[in-house]
Amino acid sequence: MSERGDDDRTTSTINSLAKRRYQDNLDTFQEERAGFQQKRPHAVDDEDEDFETAAPPTKQKTKAEEMMERMGYKAGEGLGKNKQGIQEPVALSTQRGKTGLGHEGAKAVARDMNEQWDDSTENKTVEETVIWMTDIDEGIRREICDKLIKDDQWMVVRKEKKVIDDETEFCSEKELKDMIEAKNVFDSMSDKDLREARTRANPYETIGSAFFQNRAAMKTANMDKIYDWILSRENTGNNSFLLKNPLQEGTTAENVDRHEDLFYFADVCAGPGGFSEYMLWRKAFYNAKGFGFTLAGKDDFKLQKFTASSAYFFETFYGTKKNGDVMDPENIDSLEKFISEGTDGQGVHLMMADGGFSVEGQENIQEILSKRLYLCQLLVSLCIVREGGNFFCKLFDIFTPFSVGLIYLMRVCYDSISLHKPHTSRPANSERYITCKGLRKEFAGVVKDYLKRVNRKLDELKNKNSKDDVMELMPLDVIKSDEQFMKEIIEHNEVLAHRQTVYLQKYKSFAKNQGQFDKDQGNLRDECLKYWQVPNKQRPRGGDRGSRNGNQERLNPNVVLGKYTSKICGEAELGISFRGLGAASDPQLLIGTGDAVFIYRHGHFEQIDRDYARIPENTILLVDCAEEVKTDGSKIRISSDPHMIRIADAAVLYGDNVSQLPYEARMKAAQKFALALKLTKKTIQIGWGFRAKDITPHQVCCAQTYSLKELDEFQSNLIELKQRGEVIVLFKEGDRQFKTQSLRLTRIIKQDWQMGWSKSQQVPYVHSPLHQKEGSILEDQWKKREIHSSFWDSVILTNKDKQKMTEMMQHGHNAVPSTIWSWKPCMRTEYGPYKIMNHPEAFDGKPTISAIKSQIAETDLSTLRSKYTPLTAL
């Protein structure tokens, strides 16, 4: 408070000084100007003071004044026979818009430069307190569900209603009447005048959209904070989550949630996607996967405007009808199935809904017009949210038994619910949000089925053009019998109705006097963003495309590679690695730059269409482009889908630099990255309208890894087939199959070190002839001593590395790089897939699975060793 008081005093002082300086300059100017009134200044001598100053010349009458005199006009009197004409000049018009002269509505908002708003009627705060409604008793939950299972008698159908001013069961008549009257005043104002008054009057207006694509994103940020982060499920204990999204510009972000499970959310009726852009930004990197469902067409998601995060972690769906209509029963069923498939049957952690449509000219009955939208959004949450998951949804007025009945049923389905209007929701509208915490599947399933039946009934009445409507979802007396709920819902409605009335009156005052503006807007913006833990910055115009350096990074793979690699090498050295894996060619370095995806082939980078390779910017991977194989008995068919992009190793995952982590940790992060990019449906739609088309992009998956101790498990996933006399070995990876071309054995420690097994400690250790002073280093010290082989050590073999490795091999220092065990058949020898799979010992000095397993068993027996050396089936 003292800082703000100091700021006010400083501002007042500056204003006072400015006024004084202005007056001094004006006086000086007038004094100097007096000497330039004549071309030749009058010479002043001592005698001039004795003469009287000549009177100014008489002003000549204008033609208009002469005409007025002839009509009998005299100064101070009016025209007319009885001098009844007006004497004062005609006043400036206070008329607004095109409303007729004298219209009562026009008079109510007529211009008045003396109009002043009383700030004391407002309560401007940064922090907000949300109120959770009293939880419903478990016994009542069961009673209601039992009633809904038996029949649909609670569903009341009668003649539709198009007025709201008599809905006083859940709000006092006075508050409702005052609010409606305040709304009616603006019917005579143009949209332009109303928007202009709102911009100056709303104390939180300048918060805007910050660096997101629209204001909806900031609503989510606002709600996330005041509900103690239950929406994004951020762990805010020690503020470590801020490392993912630093508040200070220029600070490097750190993925502290790399080891957390993937966060799933759904964004329903929320185009163009501000909710989702915030959630992907807040979770950061590849920690979240979103599903979107909204109307197709002009109100669709604007994925190209996702600049705070990558839209590749967001998958859209439009239902069976492909129109995104959430009120269509078939679309709801297909969305439920889609989300189940995309989340392995679990559902999303969070559903967000922001549905609405224009009710121009019918603002007072917005609740009645939106009742089915209310129903379907809340119904979808019961279909797709997982056990214990959360949900929030935009509502408007809730005065009717239908709306209040819906809210009551949400209390049955969730542990707790809350109704709240955040600061970022403009105060003069009836918008508010229902937030539901902790879904209870036991009860939600029953209510879901009931609401689906209600929606089908509404659909039936609509298709028949019936004048009837579903007016109640549960008896009014059942709701009223819950006295605590009635008290809370009435209090909520009256508080919001009063606040809305106050701000409608403020808009009216600011519309009258256009010189008024809310002086707290700038200060509130800064303090709110700080409180919500959102950086105070603006959205860049044109994104990075307005910057030459940004363009280089978005289009040049070498620029991205140079940001992260610790090795200096030429392009020719990138290909010196190892032979093919699941494909016929070498494994390839893939780099995502933002505007393009590049793969290193044949000694140079080749660009892939980014619509088909959905890889976000700042990504560096070692990949195997493999064809998926379909089988029909003994027949083998290559899938017609584009090649799979299989991750064999990872350096950078959407800006998360994992290159220095141990190989197993890198691959675990890559698995999460691939899961976030996974498409539930193989095809996606790009464009809309007549430009819309369906495409099948490359699927991204992570190659499965095994240690040599897991050869039995690996072998169980192999399928041996004969085709045209040739043995072909397929390996299963999830629900897919690939040809086994070779195995990649990855070195997990740096080239300088050799691994051993401590019999006394029963743990691995390393030692090195080149670092004898270091002695033996046990496994728990490897990370601290940087023993693990990095991505760059494994993938990029520079000429200097080759020379060092050759010298080590010459001195018998066991220089074994990451290598490939080829399984391809050879025309000159019988060695191939069949011998590798079935021969009981080494064949012609070459390894087989049985020979390796025997060697491992012997080593285990002598050292009691239990693990290590991962291999990848590729």
Swiss-Prot record:
Chain sites annotated for binding S-adenosyl-L-methionine: 273, 354
Basic and acidic residues bias locations: 1-10
Gene Ontology molecular function: any one: nucleic acid binding
GO CC terms: cytoplasm; nucleus
Active site: 394
Gene Ontology biological process terms in this record: 7-methylguanosine mRNA capping; methylation; mRNA processing
EC numbers: 2.1.1.57
Highest taxon of source: Eukaryota
Top-level class of the enzyme under EC nomenclature: transferase
Cystine crosslinks: none
SUPFAM superfamilies assigned to the protein according to its UniProt record, in alphabetical order: S-adenosyl-L-methionine-dependent methyltransferases
Region (Disordered): 1-64, 535-555
Catalyses which reaction(s): a 5'-end (N(7)-methyl 5'-triphosphoguanosine)-ribonucleoside in mRNA + S-adenosyl-L-methionine = a 5'-end (N(7)-methyl 5'-triphosphoguanosine)-(2'-O-methyl-ribonucleoside) in mRNA + S-adenosyl-L-homocysteine + H(+)
Segments forming domain G-patch: 60-106
Keywords: Methyltransferase, mRNA capping, mRNA processing, S-adenosyl-L-methionine, Transferase
Domain RrmJ-type SAM-dependent 2'-O-MTase, chain residue ranges per copy: 211-440
Function: S-adenosyl-L-methionine-dependent methyltransferase that mediates mRNA cap1 2'-O-ribose methylation to the 5'-cap structure of mRNAs. Methylates the ribose of the first nucleotide of a m(7)GpppG-capped mRNA to produce m(7)GpppNmp (cap1). Cap1 modification is linked to higher levels of translation.
Protein name: Cap-specific mRNA (nucleoside-2'-O-)-methyltransferase 1A
Organism this protein belongs to: Caenorhabditis briggsae
